[in-house]
Design a protein with these regions (language model features):
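Acidic (Asp/Glu) and glycine-rich low-complexity loops/linkers
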Residues: 2-60, 64-154, 160-173, 177-192, ...
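C-terminal amphipathic alpha-helical segment
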Residues: 260, 274-282, 294-299
Length: 360
């Protein structure tokens, strides 16, 4: 019996190998060459653009996209992709439109290992708008370009955006990291489902919104009107940030850290995660809520301070006297005597409350 099973398994293995071999021979014949089948090399397509335009619209499936400034005043689009991925480049109503069409056969999709790329050579440094709708691929926009508005949507891939944006900048990625560096005068909206957001050097008259489902957020050396960040899982860090009005941070799970920040009001709410604040000043109030997590102040202050935690200690130093009102069901309490005019209500179910006034 065992011998029969062994024979059957051997025959089955031989048939599988023969079937795979016949498939490859047939597919290669239909594809005309094995390099087209396995995607070992791409086909380069270069298209010159002679009409004037001030807006750019790109819709592609799978390609890394980058932009290069030309020195000769010419414009061209260079695509390197599978030969059955066709690119069209047109100018309509002042809009440079770049689109890809997928004409791959089914077996070419299985063995498609080509690393596709799309390079856009631009003669000018400033344009009215940049719009990109990409499925899979990395996107890079260098610093010597300037756009009035930018809107980037990406399913899978990283975005590195270093250009200046005059009005609004929106970057949304399902899976991938988003890095934004450079001056953005209007509003910045960055969003990822799975991935990190890094924002550095933004100078905004409008708001900064940085939202993630799973991922970390770092915002540094930036100014804006309001700053908002919502996320399920991940840490957030603000450093050297000036906000004219309100900072609002919500997290389900993750550490929150603020260093050298100023605002009118700071509001944060998290289920699980500690809060660390160093040299954070609010002209209005701190409103802090934690289910599980510690709160630490180092040389911070606000007119009014409200802290509520279920499990976690509240410790640190403030800059001015307050009307301290600490309450803890289980934990040590050590705060200065009530003084001044600003409120400082701190409530914990389980945790210590130890606050002092920092000597200046």
């Amino acid at each position: 019996m065992k011998k029969n099973i062994t024979v059957l398994m051997t025959v089955a293995s031989i048939l599988i190998v023969l079937g795979a071999t016949l498939f490859l021979i047939t597919a290669c014949s239909a594809s005309s060459d094995s390099s087209g089948l396995f995607g070992s090399k791409g086909v380069e397509t270069a298209i010159d653009v002679t009409d004037d335009f001030n807006k750019i619209n790109i819709v592609t499936d799978t390609a890394d996209i980058r932009f290069v400034q030309t020195n000769d005043g010419g414009c061209k689009v260079v695509a390197n992709d599978k030969k059955n991925i066709k690119y069209s480049v047109t100018v309509e109503d002042g809009i440079l439109k770049i689109n890809s069409a997928d004409e791959l056969r089914w077996y070419e999709r299985i063995f498609n290992f080509t690393k596709a790329s799309l390079t856009v050579y631009l003669p000018e440094s400033e344009y009215d708008s940049l719009t990109i709708d990409e499925h899979t691929g990395n996107i890079s926009v260098p610093s010597y370009f300037k756009f009035a508005t930018t809107d980037i949507k990406l399913s899978t891939g990283d975005v590195n955006y270093y250009a200046k944006t005059l009005e609004s900048l929106t970057v949304k990625a399902s899976t991938g990291n988003v890095t934004i560096e450079g001056e953005s005068s209007g509003t910045v909206n960055a969003e990822t489902s799975t991935g990190d957001i890094i924002l550095n050097g933004a100078v905004c008259e409008g708001d900064i919104n940085a939202n993630v489902s799973t991922g970390d957020v770092i915002i540094a050396n930036s100014t804006c009107k309001n700053l908002n960040s919502h996320g399920d899982t991940g840490d957030i860090k603000l450093e050297n940030v000036t906000v004219a009005e309100n900072v609002q941070i919500e997290r389900s799970t993750g550490k929150t850290e603020l260093i050298n920040a100023s605002c009118a009001n700071f509001d944060t709410d998290a289920d699980t995660g500690s809060l660390y604040m160093t040299n954070v000043i609010a002209s209005g109030s701190f409103t802090i809520k934690r289910s599980t997590g510690d709160v630490r102040f180092d040389g911070c202050d606000a007119r009014d301070i409200y802290v509520t935690t279920d499990t976690g200690s509240v410790k640190g130093t403030l800059l001015t006297e307050k009307l301290f009102n600490p309450r803890s069901d289980t934990g040590e309490i050590d705060t200065p005597k009530p003084s001044g005019t600003g409120a400082c209500d701190i409530t914990t179910d389980t945790g210590d409350i130890i606050i002092s006034i920092k000597q200046q």
